[in-house]
Amino acid sequence: MFNTHSVELDWGGRPLKLETGKVARQADGAVIATYGETVVMATVVSAKTPKEGIDFLPLTVNYQEKTYAAGRIPGGYFKREGRPSEKETLVSRLIDRPIRPLFADGYRCDTQVIVTTLSHDMENDPDIVAMVAASAALTLSGVPFMGPVGAARVAFVNNEFILNPTLDEMVDTQLDLVVAGTATAVLMVESEAKELPEEIMLGAVMFGHKHFQPVLKAIIELAEQAAKEPRDVVATVNADLEKEILGIVEQDLRKAYSIPVKQDRYAAVGAAKDKVLEHFFPEGIEPRYEKLRVLDVFKDLEAKIVRWNILDTGRRIDGRDLKTVRPIVAEVGVLPRAHGSALFTRGETQALVVTTLGTGEDEQYIDSLAGTYKETFLLHYNFPPFSVGETGRIGSPGRREIGHGKLAWRAIHPVLPAHHEFPYTLRVVSEITESNGSSSMATVCGSSLALMDAGVPLKRPTAGIAMGLILEGDRFAVLSDILGDEDHLGDMDFKVAGTEKGVTSLQMDIKIAGITEEIMKVALTQAKDGRMHILGEMAKALTAARAELGEHAPRIEVLQIPTDKIRDVIGTGGKVIREIVEKTGAKINIEDDGTVKVASANGESIRAAIKWIKSITSEPEVGQIYDGTVVKVMEFGAFVNFFGPKDGLVHISQLAASRVQKTSDVVKEGDKVKVKLLGLDDRGKVRLSMKAVDQTTGEDLEAKQKAENAPAAE
């Protein structure tokens, strides 16, 4: 019934198996990839006819994790998987980025790649397995895909690179880098690093590229057994059309792409486009070409003219040379009520970044296949349509916003203080108010400034820069701080973030083959120079974290209590802790290990809550004086609540210095008194004294008497 084919190899010390022909046989391509005991299924379906009226590849990639893969049932009311998690969105992008450039030019058939994690062994992260499975399914599908693509994760532990580290090995790593590419080229890099030098980052990229070569061979071997007949893609020859359009608007486009202001430039390009459309589509005459084809060629010519100008003159669209960074203005403290804020402007790109300090109650609970954990650093990136002078949708963040936010998160995360040193939940929000390239790196710069403005003690300020590359034959140009147009028209764009010490994040997308290790080395060196310049400009606003937290930020104090006292602080049904919170106004968070975090914007509120907690968890000391409340009056004395839930007896003989006939003559229930702990009687009952304490000042009268008698005795 099944015509199965499979290949197996040892990869990174674990078996990798790729199998097809048994599951999802109605898809154009389907592969089950097994790595250790992590199992991922990838399917590809592509429409048989092109989609009309579009000039792009209609490709959709969906990665999904099923909770049954980890032997769990989803939470929530409906008990089934819902909207994609952040990780699912990020892995979908990881799969999409290296495969998209490899589809044949002009392919316009709706294509959907669905990748599903079926089993997770808690050792091997499914993301790399998902990338391999998707590549294999595309290679088998008959879709015009110029792959296969391989992928690998690289860690750096004890000065050594590790291929596809397990989840346990990732705990100690200084680097988390994912690299993908073909046999001859690197296509994508995504990483987070602990301030590593550029040489190690590049070494990790080449290490990963070298070690996923066996996977490429395995996919090719499987394709030789089971690949479908490749689909025909008719390449459109546009040489004559291109020559005709050049004759009409070449000079117009060259002038347009020398206008530095984005909106003015777009207007000039639009006028050139209208001129072409008027030429090819006059009223009342049958057109010689399809409109979409003319516009496609026009767009290609835009790219060529920009590239020619840069390579021939060394000058860019806005007049800069290859290495110059646009003018920078950095400001902090721009919002009066925010805990920390910054406005970072670089040319026509601008980010308003705001930091908010929160408590343990604000931590984000993340439910993943590997288990539930709490995240104390959140970074959210918003890209409203007005930032590019357009109208558009406003609502929940899209994939691009989630991806850019995570890139900035990776750049900042390595320089944050340890949570036990700075026990706050941090939320950073970047509002992109203007955009003309590199808004994610503006977010990195603005986030660093806003965090320091809030008093968060970062290890070092962090900056980011977006780089571009244009390659034509043996000629190439590396561009620092690219514009939006240069991003679209170049062959490689990569973003590097870091401190003066080293790189914290590197993201790279390469659109063509032929980019060598030497070219990447030149690009990384130029990026470092640009980063240092940006750090210098940021230093004009702020060089380190402010010594004090913002006026409106909460204060957090941390104390440790014995774990067996946690129940006493919480009380039956939370009664005690609710009372502390209500009466002091402080927020209290208690961890299972006895760590207690007390937070409030009011220092007095924190001190009152801590005093209350200590009164519950500490043992009273003999000879110490305590504030108390009379809770019961008896003939023989009064019971006083003096140390949290603890009560003690003030015998009638200890109520006052003079003889007392009736207890009620001195105290009544509810009276606030000061008592001294005398000790325990034979039955273990607490003995207290009021007469040993000045009820007005709280002074220890016994100690005072002893001090006065001491000189007389001498």
From Swiss-Prot:
SMART domains: KH (SM00322), S1 (SM00316). One of its GO terms (cellular component) is cytosol. Residues 554-613 form the KH domain. GO terms for biological process: mRNA catabolic process; RNA processing. InterPro entries: ExoRNase_PH_dom1, ExoRNase_PH_dom2, ExoRNase_PH_dom2_sf, KH_dom, KH_dom_type_1, KH_dom_type_1_sf, NA-bd_OB-fold, PNPase. It catalyses: RNA(n+1) + phosphate = RNA(n) + a ribonucleoside 5'-diphosphate. Disulfide bonds: none annotated. GO terms for molecular function: 3'-5'-RNA exonuclease activity; magnesium ion binding; polyribonucleotide nucleotidyltransferase activity; RNA binding. It comes from the Bacteria. Its EC number is 2.7.7.8. The keyword Cell membrane does not apply. Its cofactor is Mg(2+). Its main location: cytoplasm. PANTHER family: POLYRIBONUCLEOTIDE NUCLEOTIDYLTRANSFERASE, POLYRIBONUCLEOTIDE NUCLEOTIDYLTRANSFERASE 1, MITOCHONDRIAL. HAMAP family: PNPase. Involved in mRNA degradation. Catalyzes the phosphorolysis of single-stranded polyribonucleotides processively in the 3'- to 5'-direction. Belongs to the polyribonucleotide nucleotidyltransferase family. This is Polyribonucleotide nucleotidyltransferase. The gene is pnp.
